[in-house]
């Protein structure tokens, strides 16, 4: 019997043992009897589904299996699948072009801001999405995003910061910066954390997974709003920053959001996920070069190619191609909804942080210098695509694939 299997058998017993004391002392919501009775429909690969209990979900995660919990979002992607054969492929700029505007902004990114926010975020006992701590951390994050926008004067220009509410209590957070069109560029990170051994009881500081991504895009937002053109809504495209709830439970928060967007026919032109942006030690220990891991499986190839150009132009370290499998982060929800999505991580996937999903996912293992490179990527990515003329790009692409007279 695997060790994880043996531990899994003990989980309901141990959870029940800690219910009273944990709830009274830490205010963590513990409902082991409810979790044991619930059944969830998960998707382990495209079209491969299975009904499981809550404990079985965590057993799969402990064994390295990723999945989407599609129980409440079984229709995600249906509308986009019906139009996929007739809709045009999305195209992206062939090169970066706004270096004169972007580089001055990059100079204002701050490691101090990253550290201050991450210290607060990891001070919560856990950010488990079904816990009171998870609710509290989400409320703090919502307030911090509002503070960031307010200090920049963003609310006077129509920028909004709103919770996207979920039935489990921990809400997602969406900051929206209106542009000249409703075409939307999204950057995301997940705000929740988990300890895969007794999620409702044990601590889960989640410094790297995904506290690092959460504060990375928050810092990118802070500096982006220093652009008068962006602040005043002069960008060609609308920009959204997303902090997803319940990624660890099977991409629950992001599925709910992109399901809503798909049904509303929202025009999302690009989505970039930042999940784990601060750990480099295993890369260095292996004698390899510090780099940004660019995921190349289950992503949009055109958007991913553009991201490589952004890294080359605006980051101080190179990129390395790597794979993470199906449903490995929230970009998978956007992709399933028919939106071009991409994912970057701190290193080659096999060199990524091995402290995650435990009480040992701590700040002391992270590099804020490396996190800053991800912030540079996020800021440059958003700025370049915010001002991209997608109408012009679409027309150019249509001309390039049009048949010549001799082919008719």
UniProtKB/Swiss-Prot annotation:
Record GO biological process: proteolysis
Tell me how the cofactor is bound: Binds 2 Zn(2+) ions per subunit.
The UniProt entry, under InterPro entries, shows:
M28_fam, Peptidase_M28
Annotated Zn(2+) 1 binding sites: 190, 209, 275
**Pfam families xref list:** Peptidase_M28
The record's subcellular locations are: Secreted
What the entry lists under CDD domains is as follows: M28_AAP
EC class? hydrolase
> Which positions does UniProt annotate with glycan attachment?
95, 108, 182
Cellular component annotations (GO), alphabetically ordered = extracellular region
Q: Which residues are involved in binding Zn(2+) 2?
A: 209, 248, 357
This entry's Gene Ontology molecular function terms read:
aminopeptidase activity; metal ion binding; metalloexopeptidase activity
**Alphabetic keyword roster:** Aminopeptidase, Disulfide bond, Glycoprotein, Hydrolase, Metal-binding, Protease, Secreted, Signal, Zinc, Zymogen
SUPFAM superfamilies membership: Zn-dependent exopeptidases
Which Cys residues form disulphide pairs? Answer: 324-328
Q: How does it assemble?
A: Monomer.
Homology family: Belongs to the peptidase M28 family. M28E subfamily.
Its annotated function is as follows: Extracellular aminopeptidase that allows assimilation of proteinaceous substrates.
Q: What is this protein called?
A: Leucine aminopeptidase 1
